[in-house]
Amino acid sequence: MSYDVRYLINKGYSGDFGIERSFNITAVELVKRKIIAIDSERISLVQGPPGTGKTTVFQQVINECLDETDENEVFLYVAPTNKLVADMLARVASIYRNQEKTLEDLKKEVRVYGSRFRYGGEFEHLRKPIDDDVKIVLSTEYQRIYESEAARRYHLLIDEASKSPIHRPFITISDRLLELIQQSEKEGILESLNVIGDPKQAIALGDEYRGREDLLLLTNLIRGLLSEKLKMEVDRGEIDITEAAFQELRGTFYEFLEVTRRLPHPSETPISVGFYGGNLRAYKKADEILKEVANQWDTNEARELSNLNDDYFKTVDILNSAITTGVPIIYVHVRGDYLRDYLFNERRAKVGLLFSCAIKKILKENVTIVAPYVDQQLQMKLRMHHLYGDVLGEDIKAINFTTIHRMLGAEDSHIIAILGKERTGRLYHERTIYFMEPEVFNVQLSRHKKLLVIVGDLFKLRREAKKMYEYLSGEEPRSFQESSLKLKVKQLEMTTEQILELANISSYNTLRRVPSVSSGDGCLFFRWE
């Protein structure tokens, strides 16, 4: 996909990208202190869980500090994808509009570097080298900046650094750094270093980085700023590295964005307790959100679907119960293991497709099926067209299919989360998706704005996580990787436990005596036979 620079700038000049500043005020003030030199230490680290508006922090900082920096200082925004750079360009255009700056001002003061931008003749100037007039540079991690005249000093704004290795965001200024080293210059080009990300969403890492938080930029910087005592506790697996930052660095080097505007309460509780030490809270309440959803309920469509067969009848009944009682999570227990070398579960596919059909037909709202594996995603998409095309008609095009890794950074009104293999695997190389990267579970549970439907076996996932944690606790960690994995597995267990607690079934160790239907304050449980 390519991005039209003209369209993005016009979008910024015609629309408003701001959110209420009060939600991120502490993070914005922390970064501002580093930029305008109130603090002598010029590093700020911001952790932003799902839906907390990470990128808007940098937007607000640029807006408030643009006229407070001197003529040699430049804001250098670096992001891992062209999409993020494109989004920030529209936000910068919005800033220029709000400050009553003209389009000519923007052309003169902004540079945009990426591999998928169409500049056209009018905006060709935005890809030229940096000169004395430039104030803002937006770039992907793999571009290199070039200065045509006087050397500049940069406020480095690194966005979505959740899974960025230590070196990658600095590729952009690597030529200038090398030049200074060769010239033995003492004057640095980095005026401040500001990093935003979330280690708890660091997924899809390469083998050399998986489980190695010490090789990732954000966690490495946190670790370097910790006291020796806390650093040793982190290395021994006694405390999570972000929890250590929350305790010791908050307000000086680190801030935590604690309000999610995406997830309706209490559906944020599982990941808050499991991955964020109970510090994440939701701005919106599920009962208020689902009242609006209930008003969209099409009774005729619901009746027609229910009359098709027993499976549709059950699906519509469960969906209606959750919406009318204001419960944002539906946990449909579906056993049935994945075969050893086959990443498709037919029973879970069937249930996921039934719920997506019901949501689309009855509510007329967007729904995305989030699968753990590409095989599961593709097979479900094929079955949707083959088995449910007659039911959905043209609506079939509006149901999205994706994997957890592709859903990172995205959201939808309703999410169907198909669980992957819940067993651990005997050997390290056999370890399954949730035990290789427990953060995957966090991402899968945090994409919805209204309803989350979980299809799988949470009892088994909890049991296996507990078993693995006990095993790792009995061994002396031989590396930072092992101590880190132990804590992550515990977070996986706690998250699963919290979902079961929201459905009032956490006290059951196995499924044997669990009622076929159970509902609590935040989750409706149904055993699919």
Label for each model-derived stretch:
Residues 50:
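The conserved Walker
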Residues 57-61:
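Hydrophobic positions on the alpha1 helix immediately C-terminal to the Walker A/P-loop
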Residues 4-20, 63, 68-156, 160, ...:
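Conserved P-loop NTPase motor core of helicases/translocases
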Residues 12-45:
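Conserved pre-motif I regulatory segment
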Residues 72, 81-83, 143, 155, ...:
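Conserved helicase motor core of SF1/SF2 NTP-dependent helicases
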Residues 1-6, 521, 525:
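N-terminal accessory nucleic-acid engagement/regulatory domains that precede
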Residues 53:
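Conserved glycine(s) of the Walker
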